[in-house]
């Protein structure tokens, strides 16, 4: 798979998060998400006082260059609890394999994974809630032009 494009991540919300705040009320967490694709990171806003069921409705974009990347394409969603007077607490992580999304986007120009829920887990795979996102990959015009010039499968299926 060769080419480049943009991976758009729509961070919707999370449900049933469990926190580690020992000093505050149980469930009194201020969650945010660090979205990571390879070396690129984006950080959501802090959902202050939203506790276990935060809502963000934010969109993040990542530049994808699949010619330099081999193997699996994974998106990591690391959920954190913002603490004012101490280090932020790790709430859990969700991992989404986006390899097929990128492949289909390269082939068709754009491809979408509709809103879906993903398990938030700790390192030992203990369930800590769920997060809801939708994803869209759009191939760059240069990648699409290359597919048309080469002909092959992408070209032969057009009607």
From Swiss-Prot:
Domain C2: 1-112
Positions bearing Phosphoserine: 44
GO molecular function, one term: calcium-dependent phospholipid binding
Effect of residue 44 to A: Abolishes phosphorylation, binding to phospholipids and localization to plasma membrane
Annotated keywords: Calcium, Calcium/phospholipid-binding, Cell membrane, Cytoplasm, Membrane, Metal-binding, Phosphoprotein, Plant defense
Binding site for Ca(2+) 3: 83, 86, 89
Modifications after synthesis and translation: Phosphorylated at Ser-44 by CPK18 in a calcium-dependent manner.
One Pfam family named in its UniProt record: C2
InterPro entries with a match to the protein in the record: C2_dom, C2_domain_sf
UniProt record, GO biological process: defense response
Entry-linked PROSITE patterns: C2
Binding, Ca(2+) 1: 21, 30, 81, 83
Cofactor(s) required, per the database record: Ca(2+)
Subcellular location: Cytoplasm; Cell membrane
Effect of residue 44 to D: Abolishes phosphorylation and binding to phospholipids
Tissues expressing the protein: Isoform 2 is expressed in young vascular tissues and tiller buds.
Gene Ontology CC entries for this record: cytoplasm; plasma membrane
Matching PANTHER family: 16 KDA PHLOEM PROTEIN 1, C2 DOMAIN-CONTAINING
Role this protein plays: May play a role in plant defense signaling. Isoform 2 binds to phospholipids in a Ca(2+)-dependent manner in response to pathogen elicitors.
Name under which the protein is recorded: Elicitor-responsive protein 1
Naturally occurring in which organism (per UniProt): Oryza sativa subsp. japonica
């Amino acid at each position: 798979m060769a080419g480049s494009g943009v991976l758009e991540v729509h961070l919707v919300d999370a449900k049933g998060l469990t926190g580690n705040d020992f000093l505050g009320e149980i469930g009194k967490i201020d969650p945010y998400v660090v979205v990571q694709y390879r070396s690129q990171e984006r950080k959501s806003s802090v959902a202050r006082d939203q506790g276990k069921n935060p809502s963000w409705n934010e969109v993040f974009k990542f530049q994808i260059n699949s010619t330099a990347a081999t193997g699996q394409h994974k998106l990591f969603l690391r959920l954190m609890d913002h603490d004012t007077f101490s280090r932020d607490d790790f709430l859990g992580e969700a991992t989404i394999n986006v390899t097929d999304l990128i492949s289909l986007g390269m082939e068709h120009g754009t491809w979408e994974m509709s809103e879906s829920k993903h398990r938030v887990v700790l390192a030992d795979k203990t369930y800590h809630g769920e997060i809801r996102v939708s994803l869209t990959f759009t191939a760059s015009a240069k990648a699409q032009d290359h597919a048309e010039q080469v002909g092959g499968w992408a070209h032969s299926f057009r009607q």
